[in-house]
Amino acid sequence: EEYDATMSGSMRELKISIPSLMGGTDITWHYNEASAASKVAGNYSGTTSLKVGPTMGPFVSATVGYTITANNDGTINVTASEEKYTGVTMMQNLTLGTYTVKNLAYDKATNSFSRDYSKDGIKVHFKATGGMMERDENYEFGETSKMTVTLAEDGTLTITNNYKVGRMPFPISATYTGKKAK
């Protein structure tokens, strides 16, 4: 069925009135740029390069996924998939489980999202096998744990994640690079 409609306003504020539809219907379209959080939201696949302390590494996990969701307040949540590394000094085979860092805030000056999550109580499953340091347990991210997310104009996502796990003596620095999954 067809209904008579009127359009008024500008291309940035368009109103469509349909008086005979459901007792009268108005649709108002507000043009606005997509938020930075909306632009970065999605599922990504790529690689992570990991360093333990100042000298060990880099070690590479070649098939890593990240999911980024936009929050209504303009922040984002970042969920890491499981990451597997081989040949890691003292640990040999290292698996880091999935975890989520919430409410990374946007900084327009650096065009990036970041959060110090060291006091958020987030835990990660840490499994090390085949080396001098065998572990298979959950650890809380500790002091100096900070994540920064940047989306380049070409769609490349970079996540810099510097953290400590439990009482381990060395900080870990990880750099993820990926693109939106198809």
Model-derived segments and spans:
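Tryptophan-anchored aromatic micro-motifs
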Residues: 31-60
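A short hydrophobic beta-strand element
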Residues: 12-14, 44, 78-80, 113-119, ...
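Short, cysteine-centered beta-strand-loop-beta hairpins and adjacent loop/turn segments enriched
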Residues: 21-23, 51-58, 85-95, 125-129, ...
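Edge beta-strand at a domain terminus
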Residues: 11-42, 96-108, 144, 152-182
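Predominantly extracellular/secreted and cell-surface proteins with exposed
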Residues: 1, 60-145
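Helix-rich interaction surfaces within compact, conserved domain-sized segments
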Residues: 139, 149-152
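Sec-type signal peptide cleavage vicinity
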Residues: 27, 56-57, 65-72, 172-176
